[in-house]
Amino acid sequence: MLSFVDTRTLLLLAVTSCLATCQSLQEATARKGPTGDRGPRGERGPPGPPGRDGDDGIPGPPGPPGPPGPPGLGGNFAAQYDGKGVGLGPGPMGLMGPRGPPGASGAPGPQGFQGPAGEPGEPGQTGPAGARGPPGPPGKAGEDGHPGKPGRPGERGVVGPQGARGFPGTPGLPGFKGIRGHNGLDGLKGQPGAPGVKGEPGAPGENGTPGQTGARGLPGERGRVGAPGPAGARGSDGSVGPVGPAGPIGSAGPPGFPGAPGPKGEIGPVGNPGPAGPAGPRGEVGLPGVSGPVGPPGNPGANGLTGAKGAAGLPGVAGAPGLPGPRGIPGPVGAAGATGARGIVGEPGPAGSKGESGNKGEPGSAGAQGPPGPSGEEGKRGPNGEAGSAGPSGPPGLRGSPGSRGLPGADGPAGVMGPPGPRGATGPAGVRGPNGDSGRPGEPGLMGPRGFPGAPGNVGPAGKEGPMGLPGIDGRPGPIGPAGARGEPGNIGFPGPKGPTGDPGKNGDKGHAGLAGARGAPGPDGNNGAQGPPGPQGVQGGKGEQGPAGPPGFQGLPGPAGTAGEVGKPGERGLPGEFGLPGPAGPRGERGPPGESGAAGPSGPIGSRGPSGPPGPDGNKGEPGVLGAPGTAGASGPGGLPGERGAAGIPGGKGEKGETGLRGEIGNPGRDGARGAPGAMGAPGPAGATGDRGEAGPAGPAGPAGPRGTPGERGEVGPAGPNGFAGPAGAAGQPGAKGERGTKGPKGENGPVGPTGPIGSAGPSGPNGPPGPAGSRGDGGPPGATGFPGAAGRTGPPGPSGITGPPGPPGAAGKEGLRGPRGDQGPVGRTGETGASGPPGFTGEKGPSGEPGTAGPPGTPGPQGLLGAPGILGLPGSRGERGLPGVAGSVGEPGPLGIAGPPGARGPPGAVGAPGVNGAPGEAGRDGNPGNDGPPGRDGQAGHKGERGYPGNIGPVGAVGAPGPHGPVGPTGKHGNRGEPGPAGSVGPVGAVGPRGPSGPQGIRGDKGEPGEKGPRGLPGLKGHNGLQGLPGLAGQHGDQGAPGSVGPAGPRGPAGPSGPAGKDGRTGQPGTVGPAGIRGSQGSQGPAGPPGPPGPPGPPGPSGGGYDFGYEGDFYRADQPRSPPSLRPKDYEVDATLKSLNNQIETLLTPEGSRKNPARTCRDLRLSHPEWSSGYYWIDPNQGCTMDAIKVYCDFSTGETCIRAQPENIPAKNWYRNSKVKKHIWLGETINGGTQFEYNVEGVTTKEMATQLAFMRLLANHASQNITYHCKNSIAYMDEETGNLKKAVILQGSNDVELVAEGNSRFTYTVLVDGCSKKTNEWRKTIIEYKTNKPSRLPILDIAPLDIGDADQEFRVDVGPVCFK
């Protein structure tokens, strides 16, 4: 098919050849006339080609300094994010320093790249006339000149006979266009013309527009697994997953470097009583202590010296029963147990009922957090030794061998952009490129206008004189000849085009004032006005009522350890009291107050060991007996069997201090004693061995902000990673596979199992107070009610090890073994293996809230707020008159940054910028694909301390070191054999009291004894604390519908809603009354000469006479004056009419009007054809062809967009979905509204035709955008303010089944201009969502899927904005 331009060219060629043929015939019969007048001025030509791009502007001034970066991680989190810290880490973040002064202006940046070509400029003004060019070459020979002036008239000849009819004259100049005549009668149908010669094949046409999208094909066979794609770009950090289950207990790591000495720790839990060490030298006499309870009868002692008789003591008064003692403090938390097997997922329980608001706790004083001390070797905890004075720190250990290469760390936060470097030198000019391909031949130009008539030719030579004619006789004037035969009818011409508007007539007389017309019908609703300026700041509203308490939050991270309390002052040491004689066993009474101490009696003789008697019944409480006289010491009897334990007796009176007895034999190791009171400070012990590396302490306080560093050099550019397209967000992965089992650690001693501590009861939630200044970090809250099971998170990092549980109760004492032969001194045994950890203790009671911390420093400026909703397009204004040129404006501020240009050439290395502040922790990103092997890393940091080396050779004896800190309890020695009793020595004098010796090494644990006799039934224990909240029960049956609540008070007036869409066009109004007569038009200009009249009658006969009179009285006439009536020359007018009709049709195609009969292809075509038009509704036909399926759209000429409205534009507000159990995204159109998706129809166009037009619109555009407004009542649309995440955001469905989401791949995420639906306030709010893309196939939006719906009080409605293509 011929293109439009080809058709037009052929037509013009045909017409030109036809005119040329006619002209040649005319020239054969008529001589060329004189030069005609100059033609009228032609119409304005089309706009010229676009001007070349302007030169680049000068670089703008440097921008203002940016705001300070966000604060770094707090001290408490630094340790969690950096496991490589050694020793003391940095402290908590210091206060933010003041904002620095703006930096000096940077050097001007490098020249920017050439910007994109601008829009074609307006045609420039006609330039001044150029200088006169050089003379041209001689022209072609001119045409024949005009005929010379007529010669003198010859003598009059004889009247000749009437001549034949002359040839018709040349057609006259076209006359001015006449006013439109009445429609002529329909002409007869012409004969079909002969078939034309087959034309040459036309030039290949341009590529047609792509056809409609075909129906979706059947799914193909499953393809082979493709090669793994390139590594995708790192996704945005996902939200932090829940803390995973505690990992298995890892193997013991190598000992670390010695940590710095920590501060004094808290008083540790009571340890197991250690085995009795060998007896130390006798201590100083202590102050008299309070008598202890009566012990069991001891073995008879050796005979003592006879003491003096003591004075009889007064019987003590029986004390009243004491009040019950206060409740003991909860025990320390036990160690975390090994990870149990993963339980099966329980069914989701119903939401728990809201607890009552508790009273606000008293503020506790916030203590400074002490760094953790170095971790000691794990063993049985011995009794607290006397604290030695801290010795000097030992020398640092040798540097360990470098550790194995660590895994690559996470990307650090982006540093602050350094100052721009100086501008580099201009590079050398590039080599001239090869010549480009020659351009395509242009289309043939339109036929130029007809040239002006040539200049008159030279006068021709005079003709020969003719022969003398014979004188004729004067004839009579002849009669008028008959009219000629009627010419053949011409072909019916094309209907002439509509003539141009005639010149205005002369002003008419002023008419009478007409009657007032009838009131017109109301016009159509105007488009919404542009958004007004923001109103003044409103008065601050009163404080709202306190909202209901929120649901319990997620369980917080464990709080930092509290500071250790001040160690209590050591009590004064009491004198050990002597045991009184046991009284008779009374019945077990209530515990009385301690009686006064009785006087001490002399030691009795050692009696023989009697058999164990049966336990007597508890007797009544007896009166204290009179102190008996001391008996003489008896001989030592054999040891009897242990008797059953009698009931505790009443405390006896305090005895007098006895004299020092003989030194007894060294007894067997006694049972573990109770924990002793802290002793006095001992002398510093010898320096201990270097301790293992301590755990990393928490971050220390941030140092003051350092001065700004000088700019460093720019680092080398790293290797470019593969450009992977980021895939769509994957679902959260299942927990990762269990890691390989670590190497088996050395077996520890079997530690005693600690008792389970009581459960702390959770305090009730307090009422929400007004938001205070940021306090210091509080303790972890009680666990909330069990929520619905969330999606499976990724496996979290192993949880921290639990606190070691308190030691269990001591085992029963074993039987005394048989005495074996004395063995040789054995070697020191190796350290026993570490015992298994005790079960985890329960959470303690929630401590009181701390006092509110001081107000933190002002926060960094928040991120830029979301863009406001674009205002509704205003009504197109009428085109204003052209204004006068304005005064030259002042230089404007630098404009916004342009679109990012292509990457510049590599600049010189810039200076290293100051280290940026640590950014806030981002949400954990989704797992990326495994990256390629990175380049070899730099040398790692010093590795951990290696395993203990083999013992070296014995070195020389060093000098005595300064006394070190108290060393750890040594390993337990083996149980020695009992020595033979030595002979009793004579009593020596009492020696001076020596200093207290250091504690001896702990003996190894004895064999487990046989179980002792069953003790008496203990007192009933105190009521235990409440247990942990059980798992939610099975869902109960649905309760009956509650009675409707009372109507709440009217809410405050909501914000003004968005302007509604423009109303439909109003009906056409009734015709108005006939207006008054117009003013008479001005005098028209003189028309062209009319066609020549018919030939005149023959002239009168000449005068008779004998002379020759060749007088000629006819007027001269010009050759271009018509001499024949127009009816005789119809063919020229047909050609003229045809040409004009064709020209009008071509103009119509080239400059569409945007009407239904003459639609444009897109709004861009209309804007290019009519740049003076304003935005509004026009008709377009993207698929071209027949105009019956043209569609009416809104053309925004300011942006060049074509916008199509949805039908309907509003989804009404109601509770669309009732199901509070299922919480998932529900598609509004597909599921809720019965499969009715959003439609974009235009009146008079079917859905299929509209789909075709939309498909062409997408092909013709390279950019599309659309807005959706979600009006909500108690429904989250995007950000959930309570949780701070986007998990409840709505999903949109695009045209090609792509889902547009709130987070994930940036190509499929929408943006939010206004987010009012972030919390549930029982009021109507709105969220405006916008999606812009350079893939028009994704729009328009067809459906929306909210998640947070289903409850009785949740309603929503949707406004679907127009889809705009560009």
From Swiss-Prot:
Segments of skewed composition (Gly residues): 84-94, 538-547, 634-643, 775-784
Protein name per its UniProtKB record: Collagen alpha-2(I) chain
Annotated residues for binding of Ca(2+): D1181, N1183, Q1184, C1186, D1189
Residues annotated with 5-hydroxylysine modification: K177
One example GO MF annotation: metal ion binding
Main location group: secreted
Subunit comment: Trimers of one alpha 2(I) and two alpha 1(I) chains. Interacts (via C-terminus) with TMEM131 (via PapD-L domain); the interaction is direct and is involved in assembly and TRAPPIII ER-to-Golgi transport complex-dependent secretion of collagen.
Entry function: Type I collagen is a member of group I collagen (fibrillar forming collagen).
GO annotations of cellular component type: collagen type I trimer; collagen-containing extracellular matrix; extracellular space
Organism: Canis lupus familiaris (Dog)
Sequence ranges of Low complexity compositional bias: 95-132, 225-254, 279-293, 300-321, 330-345, 384-408, 423-434, 470-489, 513-531, 594-611, 668-690, 717-737, 756-765, 785-795, 863-876, 893-932, 951-974, 981-1001
Top-level taxonomy: Eukaryota, Metazoa, Chordata, Craniata, Vertebrata
Domain Fibrillar collagen NC1: 1133-1366
Post-translational modification summary for this protein: Prolines at the third position of the tripeptide repeating unit (G-X-Y) are hydroxylated in some or all of the chains.
Segments of skewed composition (Pro residues): 59-71, 1089-1103
Alphabetized InterPro entries for the sequence: Collagen, Collagen_superfamily, Fib_collagen_C
Propeptide: 23-79, 1120-1366
